């Protein structure tokens, strides 16, 4: 057993802990000294036990810093708007956002008043968790500083944190589905009189491209699958849950696996995002749950009609209103190492900040566009997840989500030991119904971006007395479904969660009916139907949905590709021969041993997405699981496009230097731990449930940056939960840690691990180790 003594004070890197005034100032009177017991089991997963929230937070912050100090320190720099100060304005964040634009966003977002308001809205339990987290993190930081910080963050930008930093991190997560996607557009919004046409066009065009690409990547990088099986279909007659969130493998959205216990009050295990002292996805003694990124709208744009006399004033109900002006300043590192303060004015209307995208959301002499983000007023998010963590029944779990309404931009799926399966699309959504949308928007714009008339008050969000926040939908008017067979979700609307009970008739901002399903949802519904026909559904069946790596779209189009290959190809026959042979030999999966035919297939189908007439059978809302399907190779234009796509695929593979005998495991890898590990899975758009997003690496390889992250399959018996799982990218982001690649290797080998939950299971783990930490009481 490792027993750590209380640490009284630390001085390092020229900084004393006495300087963390914000954190110290926020400590509530009467706090007892924090004490936590951190028990580590296999793969370094911490099981943290404490008598109260402060002690629990203390253990969480300490354990997290042991495993991910550099990661969190870097994110703290980001949310403080200080990247330009330390790294220069022209470099980019991990999310490929320009440092200067990022800093301006967070300087605008995380003002002292915004942080104070958020903190004041938190109940004592949440404050205690956060205060404990800060103390635990700072203790670990001091210890590691004495020993020598990890090389990636042995730098001046690493410092003790405060509760304000945790608030900043939380608010950053809240706006991921809204204004967070508009950093460049917010930073570049400039009144027409101050615009320099050529310069602004170039800068803003780039901003638009980056933001649009990030908007598209949002669902890809933060997608997910979840399946909740009820007692009618489960092999043991109890609830059974598959959680398969697809999240980034690095940065501020990288999950951390842990188990949190306050005896008699809390006992929950699962995964959490950086800086959060609670579980986001997991299970407790009574239930298990997961989240999937929803398709609901969490912000609206408002077209402002400008005052002809002044483009920084707008007309509202016929009255001229001055835009708000908030000056933010970013400290920018100069070439000689000195700092220069760069001021910028962020303009806003009553709806929110003005954003500017040339050619799409222009700020000219007539109009400007303002963005209203529903989650900017969501100060309930931490209370929400803590209530879910503590829920002792599915009803209590559901009631908490209905009442608190703190879920920012995800659906929730859950099961309980009694065999109920629950789906809730209860996130924070602007209260704009179909009638108001019809009155207040241009139908030609569509619903990809909701643009409302900003010149009329009646077009603002409706306020309902039932809602937890002014201007959002009350939970009673959002999709919910309780079943005893199944519910599932893979980032489509709520419509086809279970085809036996379609969820229809909601505001377009919440959920849209009659839209084509994504390939992963079609795969899941098809697989569940097959399993249902064959008998009861087992844990192994749910694991196989992820790990057998079926490429669902191959079943729809591969026969047509092979038929085309067997047709008269003329002068292209010789060039296409390797491709056609590889497609014929391919097993239709994204496994490590799957052949190079999968690479050709990806490239072909990516090219064919631009061909609107490619499907032989068009989408039919009466049969959304099986349509659209088949490549219309008998259509001359489709055949021409297909031939071109195949030839381009041949050229791409040759250019990448991939040998004919290459296997998918030779190509798709993860090397974030410092060594290359083959990774199975593939693109979500092809119907690979085990979705992976990659970027180009060296020698034709693809480096995984996002995808399957925390995996869990949970069911129940008389004693409680029985869970198996994995954290695909491993527990630690420090390449020097023993736990930076161990779970990644297990994931590569498809080796699910039993998750120790009970005291007996934890203490019986071969890797069991205990560390007790405590702090001195307040004096």
UniProtKB/Swiss-Prot annotation:
The active site is at 224 (nucleophile). CDD domains: Ntn_CA. Residues 731-746 have a biased composition (Polar residues). Its main location: periplasm. It is found in: Periplasm. GO terms for molecular function: hydrolase activity, acting on carbon-nitrogen (but not peptide) bonds, in linear amides. This is Acyl-homoserine lactone acylase PvdQ. Its EC number is 3.5.1.97. It comes from Pseudomonas syringae pv. syringae (strain B728a). One of its GO terms (biological process) is quorum sensing. AHL-mediated signaling mediates quorum sensing in many species of Proteobacteria, regulating hundreds of genes, including many that code for extracellular virulence factors. It catalyses: an N-acyl-L-homoserine lactone + H2O = L-homoserine lactone + a carboxylate. Residues 731-750 are annotated as: Disordered. It is an enzyme of class 3 (hydrolase). Heterodimer of an alpha subunit and a beta subunit processed from the same precursor. Residues 1-25 form the signal peptide. Residues 202-223 form a propeptide.
